């Protein structure tokens, strides 16, 4: 890039520059560590403020250019003279919200060559956010862009000066010699030495196990097992904070309201999900205690819904609360949006999409089955391969768990087929939530919750619609695990008490599906498995590396939201434990599922083949043919997967012209080695890891990472409120067993089936908490970046990469039109269902708010 341009600068020439930054007071909500602080201060005086822009002038901030072409006596790029910000640029068309621009001039001459990096020092007490530096008027070279997006603290906090590189792209072996030292030094700086408690201003990326979920110092009931680092509880790694161990358990880390993040992983942009995320924290710290007092201390309102109409009242008239309670939870702006107070002491939720057209469509068997293909958890259903379904649990410990569903249960409804013929024709399907819960079921049922392990068998009719034929509810044998399971089989019914029993049977299935969705499909398979990639990438791939530039948009805000989850959602006594059936065992159970996690099966085509939902077919797009043609998640997902993979292929081919070049890339090989051996270290000996020896290995790995962080997360996250906002449709816990004939509960089921259903599923208090959380999780921020978008048009100087990226964006726009046309095809019944709710979750674009569409680049909420 810089070869052949040395000597083109006139001696004594001044290089003109523009620095864009953001003051802390317009940006940084993260300086407030408690929601109470947010509520008490309001959003007009966030953090320590810099009163005005003139504070940046004088000798407050210095910059020093580094040559990319001229070395000093030690071989390092020559340093220019330090210079300071000169004046405020009052108007600049490219400035974003909250950004300020400053003029700067650098003394430079032909002995210095071409700038390729710069140092910056902040001499003020308050940090600021550096957005970019642009150098103009470089003879015969044009402009040089430095995309920074980083917090700059007072220089005393840094042993090594903060450095930024121009937006060129280099493999390690192609780095201009004068920049090699600086490139390696910056990576070493980001890795740290693995010791000590991390400080707010640090940018160190390191690994740790999940040892901060519990609080053993508060008692045995508050302790949680350490996840990761053992054969019993394998888990992906999280970011290391270095907090002190707890007093009672040296293996557990003490908890605090402040959770260290590498500073640039905390939201560093004007992002409404700052408010969404702190809204999540507010639900945990403010809303939960306030509502607990309403339901359990004041007895202001009963904790049971009386009828389905009362549930619908949450969206119509709202729920009345005492005035003082409202005043505790509504001042935070995001909560004002979520809890629509009407001035009459009521909280009101927006109506979820699942009831916007039909209030009763959710109750139908067709919708129950359709949501397995187009709902919020569409990647669990399998094509039935053997009958009866068998368990993979160790029979030496758990006995025989073979399904009790028989041919007699199924064949009357197979349209003349035998079970064997239906399996051969790929007409039978299974939603299996048996093995994941059974080892914990005895413990779960010893609390106030009552649940079953479930298996659901469905039939694909000639209209491509699934219909449930049988549901098996299983309990551990009362005489001990080794005796197997006690199972009950239920079949569809349309009227009488049998229809009420059938609705309850479906509810037990959905409770299991809700837990599996939240803890596995959502948390584990997107949030948790991606975090090690974020850490490894920052530790081993320089920002000059092409693969860093490819992947970094797909990491935006992920470590931040994950740290918040450990603080308020998946921790001991957190919102997940309070509102979901798995309770205190939630994270532990997700660890058991991670035992069977296979990285290469996270590619959508491989996942579909594994579940029997597709067969290999070289003549079909993505090399697979779907077993269910009208499978909205899979049909749309394969389109998105193909576009992602094509973009990755196009990009990778620009920099790796041979497999040998990839094998010799020291940063890439160190990145992959550490990702496998440390980041996912509990799986390091698995044979299925790509060896990172070929370009195809790299393309597949990057495609899986981008797919997981973008489209997969979008599919399992942004429909949560649209489907689960109606607790009747997606209950999160069950509190009673199926009523037995002759019991009072059975009589209630006969006389008041709605009341019996409501007494079985999630009660009112947990419902309000659940709805509050999933409404926040389902929202898009105002400045969300979607697939095909970047935060800066100058993210690379490589015009070939920019052209390939433009092609990627155009393809995504084309596919969105295609998906819209598909949703208008009335023959594709699974795209709407009885609730008349088009499947839009994989539309690439979206506006702000609750939209039920849009694929953000990253796991940012």
Curated annotation (Swiss-Prot):
It is found in: Cytoplasm. Its cofactor is Fe cation. Residues 237-246 have a biased composition (Basic residues). Signal peptide: none annotated. GO terms for cellular component: cytoplasm. It comes from the Eukaryota. Residues 247-257 have a biased composition (Basic and acidic residues). It catalyses: (9Z,12Z)-octadecadienoate + O2 = (9S)-hydroperoxy-(10E,12Z)-octadecadienoate. InterPro entries: LipOase, LipOase_C, LipOase_C_sf, LipOase_CS, LipOase_Fe_BS, LipOase_plant, Lipoxy_PLAT/LH2, Lipoxygenase_dom_3. Its main location: cytoplasm. Residues 41-166 form the PLAT domain. Belongs to the lipoxygenase family. Pathway: Lipid metabolism; oxylipin biosynthesis. Residues 169-861 form the Lipoxygenase domain. Keywords: Cytoplasm, Dioxygenase, Fatty acid biosynthesis, Fatty acid metabolism, Iron, Lipid biosynthesis, Lipid metabolism, Metal-binding, Oxidoreductase, Oxylipin biosynthesis. Plant lipoxygenase may be involved in a number of diverse aspects of plant physiology including growth and development, pest resistance, and senescence or responses to wounding. It catalyzes the hydroperoxidation of lipids containing a cis,cis-1,4-pentadiene structure. Binds 1 Fe cation per subunit. Fe cation binds at residues 522, 527, 713, 717, 861. This is Seed linoleate 9S-lipoxygenase-3. One of its GO terms (biological process) is fatty acid biosynthetic process. Residues 215-257 are annotated as: Disordered. Its EC number is 1.13.11.58. One of its GO terms (molecular function) is linoleate 9S-lipoxygenase activity. CDD domains: PLAT_LH2 (cd01751).
């Amino acid at each position: 890039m810089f070869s052949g341009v040395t000597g083109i600068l006139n001696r004594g020439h001044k290089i003109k520059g523009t620095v864009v930054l953001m003051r802390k007071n317009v940006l940084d909500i993260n300086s407030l560590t408690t929601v109470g602080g947010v509520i008490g201060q309001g959003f007009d005086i966030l953090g320590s403020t810099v009163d005005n822009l003139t504070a940046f002038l004088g000798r407050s901030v210095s910059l020093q250019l580094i040559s990319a072409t001229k070395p000093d006596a030690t071989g390092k790029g020559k340093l220019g003279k330090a210079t300071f910000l000169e004046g405020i640029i009052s108007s600049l068309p490219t400035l974003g919200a909250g950004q300020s621009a400053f003029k700067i001039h650098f003394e430079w001459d032909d002995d210095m060559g071409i700038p390729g990096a710069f140092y910056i020092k902040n001499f003020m007490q308050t940090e600021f956010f550096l957005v970019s530096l642009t150098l103009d008027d470089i003879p015969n070279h044009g402009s040089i862009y430095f995309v920074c997006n980083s917090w700059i603290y007072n220089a005393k906090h840094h042993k090594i000066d903060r450095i930024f590189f121009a937006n060129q792209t280099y493999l390690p072996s192609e780095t201009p010699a004068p920049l090699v030292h600086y490139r390696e030094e910056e990576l070493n700086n980001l890795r740290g030495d693995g010791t000590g408690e991390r400080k707010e201003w640090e940018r160190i990326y390191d690994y740790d196990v999940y040892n901060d979920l519990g609080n053993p110092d508060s008692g045995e009931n508050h302790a949680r097992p350490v996840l990761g680092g053992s054969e019993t509880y394998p888990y992906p790694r999280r970011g290391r904070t270095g907090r002190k161990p707890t007093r009672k358990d040296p293996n557990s880390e003490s908890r605090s309201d402040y959770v260290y993040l590498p500073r640039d992983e905390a939201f560093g942009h004007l992002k409404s999900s700052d408010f969404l995320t702190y809204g999540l924290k507010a639900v945990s710290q403010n809303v939960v205690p306030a509502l607990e007092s309403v339901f359990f201390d004041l007895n202001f309102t009963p904790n049971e819904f009386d009828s389905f109409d009362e549930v619908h009242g949450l969206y119509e008239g709202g729920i009345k609360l005492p005035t003082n309670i409202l005043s505790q939870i509504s001042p935070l702006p995001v909560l004002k949006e979520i809890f629509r107070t009407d001035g009459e002491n009521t909280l009101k939720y927006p109506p979820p999409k699942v009831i916007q057209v039909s209030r009763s469509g959710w109750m139908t068997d067709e919708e129950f089955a359709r949501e397995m293909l187009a709902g919020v958890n569409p990647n669990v259903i399998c094509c039935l391969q053997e009958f009866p379904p068998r368990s993979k649990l160790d029979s030496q410990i758990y006995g025989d768990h073979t399904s009790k569903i028989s041919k007699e249960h199924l064949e009357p409804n197979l349209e003349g087929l035998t079970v064997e013929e239906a399996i051969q024709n790929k007409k039978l399907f299974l939603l299996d939530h048996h093995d994941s819960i059974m080892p914990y079921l005895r413990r779960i049922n010893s609390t106030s919750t009552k649940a079953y392990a479930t298996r659901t068998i469905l039939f694909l009719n000639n209209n491509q619609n699934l219909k449930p034929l049988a549901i098996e509810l299983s309990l551990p044998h009362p005489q001990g695990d080794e005796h197997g399971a006690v199972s009950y089989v239920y079949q569809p019914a349309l009227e009488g008490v049998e229809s009420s029993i059938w609705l309850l049977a479906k509810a037990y299935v959905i409770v299991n599906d809700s837990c599996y969705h939240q803890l596995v499909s959502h948390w584990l398979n997107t949030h948790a498995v991606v975090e090690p990639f974020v850490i490894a990438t920052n530790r081993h791939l320089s920002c000059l590396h092409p693969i860093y530039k490819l992947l970094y948009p797909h990491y935006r805000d992920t470590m931040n939201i994950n740290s918040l989850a450990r603080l308020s959602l998946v921790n001991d006594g957190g919102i997940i434990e309070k509102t979901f059936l798995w309770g205190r065992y939630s994270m532990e159970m997700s660890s058991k599922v991670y035992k069977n996690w296979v990285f290469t099966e996270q590619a959508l085509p491989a996942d579909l083949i594994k579940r029997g939902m597709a067969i290999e077919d070289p003549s079909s797009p993505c090399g697979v043919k779907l077993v269910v043609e009208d499978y909205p998640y899979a049909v749309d997902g394969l389109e998105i997967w193909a576009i992602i993979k094509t973009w990755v292929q196009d990009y990778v081919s620009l920099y790796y012209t041979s497999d040998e070049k990839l094998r010799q890339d020291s940063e890439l090989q160190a990145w992959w080695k550490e990702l496998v051996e440390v980041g996912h270290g509990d799986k390091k000996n698995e044979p299925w890891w790509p060896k990172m020896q070929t370009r195809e290995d790299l393309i597949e790995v990057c495609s899986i990472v981008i797919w997981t962080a973008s489209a997969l997360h979008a599919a399992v996250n942004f429909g949560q409120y649209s489907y689960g906002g109606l607790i009747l449709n997606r209950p999160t816990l069950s509190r009673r067993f199926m009523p037995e004939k002759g019991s009072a509960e059975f009589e209630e089921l006969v006389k008041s089936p709605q009341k019996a259903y409501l007494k079985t599923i999630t009660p009112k208090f947990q419902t309000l908490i659940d709805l509050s959380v999933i409404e926040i999780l389902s929202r898009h921020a105002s400045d969300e970046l979607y697939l095909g978008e970047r935060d800066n048009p100058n993210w690379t100087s490589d015009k070939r990469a920019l052209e390939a990226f433009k092609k990627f964006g155009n393809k995504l726009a084309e596919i969105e039109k295609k998906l819209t046309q598909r949703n208008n095809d009335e023959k594709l019944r699974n795209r709407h269902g009885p609730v008349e709710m088009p499947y839009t979750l994989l539309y690439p674009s979206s506006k702000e708010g609750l939209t039920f569409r849009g694929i953000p680049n990253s796991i940012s909420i």
